[in-house]
Amino acid sequence: MDDNIINWLQKWTISQVNGDWEHELGVSITMLDNPGWILCADISEYFDFVLNSVPTGGKLNNDWLDYYIIAKEFSAYLYINGDLKKLNHLLYIFRGIIQELEKIKNEGKGILTVDRIKYIVDNVSNELLDTPAGTSL
């Protein structure tokens, strides 16, 4: 498996393009004014496996990370926010959540709970802390 996060994001995005998905939210990464980053993704393909959630991350001055899912009317959107030093985190967390949703979808049962998302976030954060600079997960 290719561990380059940008290559993974490109491949996943290509797999989602169906004539409709890309005209809606698709995937976007933009800067927030507080300042920080936000990754937004249309994850409606996984609607049956997600629940609405409220922001569940933590904020501590300039070191923060937040994430939540909005699911309604057969649409689902994932939002991952972080301070300016968290762009890499956002991308790897997104990949971890999508990989978990793929697993649930393939098994045909289960729900991605807030606790499971927190586990993914914590796991990614720990792996990034343990990864030497200049290398990838």
Where are these regions (language model features)?
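Eukaryotic proteins' extreme N-terminal regulatory segments
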Residues: 1-19
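Helix-rich interaction surfaces within compact, conserved domain-sized segments
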Residues: 62-107
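Hydrophobic residues embedded in beta-strands of well-ordered beta-sheets
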Residues: 37-39, 74-76, 126-129
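Short beta-strand-centered aromatic/proline hotspots
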Residues: 121
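Basic/aromatic-rich interaction segments and small domains that mediate binding to polyanionic partners
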Residues: 127-137
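Amphipathic, interaction-prone secondary-structure segments
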Residues: 14-58
